[in-house]
Amino acid sequence: MMASKDFLDKLVQTCPDGIIGIDRKGTVIIFNAAAEKLTGLAGKDVIGKLSIQDVYPDPEIAREVKKQIYSKEHGAPGSVEGLEVTVKGPEGRKIPIRLSAALIFEDEVEVGSVGFFHDLTDRKELEEELRRRSITDSLTNLYNRRHFHTTLMEAMARFARYKRPLSMAVFDLDNFKPFNDTYGHQEGDNILRLVTECTRSVFRQTDHTFRLGGDEFAVLLVETDLAKAGQVMERFKAHFTEEWSLKMEYLGRTLRPVTMSIGVAQLAVGEKADKFQLRADLAMYEAKSAGGNRVVLASKKIGE
């Protein structure tokens, strides 16, 4: 059997998690193959030459890790378990890891510490993908109704704090069901995707567009008053009509024209979210009742 030191060296080097050992001064003295892969650094360039602080993207992280090791928050004093931090990866990327570390003592004297670095990149990417799917409409890749309510409350909180105007537009496609019945759901889906393309051409990155369901959509226009929001939605409506015509011309097809009815409301001071949305909805219904293919600005109060 191989000598115990050789066995321990093999054990350290073959461990799938990064292992970094430091002396009492903070200089790296152990840097296994997994740590090399994680950070993009070669052990020969690290051991005896770099400090543990050089492994983290921010010195504050190293200080926080040291603080946690000496506290009881993540384990017994002298150790830390499951602390999620980031380390510097190849090309300066920040790599999320789960850190477990412990102080090393000889004759009750602290001589260094060892840390185990478990790469969380795959898990974090999966979590982000699941989060994205939970707030996104699968057909259009716009935000869904669930995220609409969350985003609306956040936007209203900013409005209450900064007093900058916030407007909402709600719109749907005129006679969408007859269109679907005539040409099939695939053609209907193509229209919904075209709506998405047009939103990206007209609205700012700071605005938020949602598919609420079916052919109903909503847009939150930040720092935009009612008059300006109305102008933006008129431009959006015209752009959609133009893109639809160009698409039909390109495909050499003649389908029933598609238009939209749009209602726009501006948030009033002290107004609740449900009333804000209701005013936009009522304005949209008014546009539809008047024949569709138009933008209607909501009254400040319901019934006015």
Model-predicted regions and their roles:
Residues D45-E60:
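PAS-family sensory/regulatory domains
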Residues H208-R211:
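A short pre-motif secondary-structure segment
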Residues L99-A101, F117:
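Sensory-domain boundary capping and coupling elements
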Residues R131-T150, F171-G184, R193:
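Conserved nucleotide-binding and Mg2+-coordinating catalytic segments in signaling enzymes
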Residues R131-R132, R145-P165, T196-R204, V222:
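Short regulatory alpha-helical coupling segments
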Residues V109-D119:
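PAS-family sensory domains
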Residues P57-R93, V232:
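Terminal output helix/cap of sensory domains in signal transduction proteins
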Residues L226, G230, E234, R253, ...:
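Catalytic-core segments of nucleotide cyclases and related cyclic-nucleotide turnover enzymes
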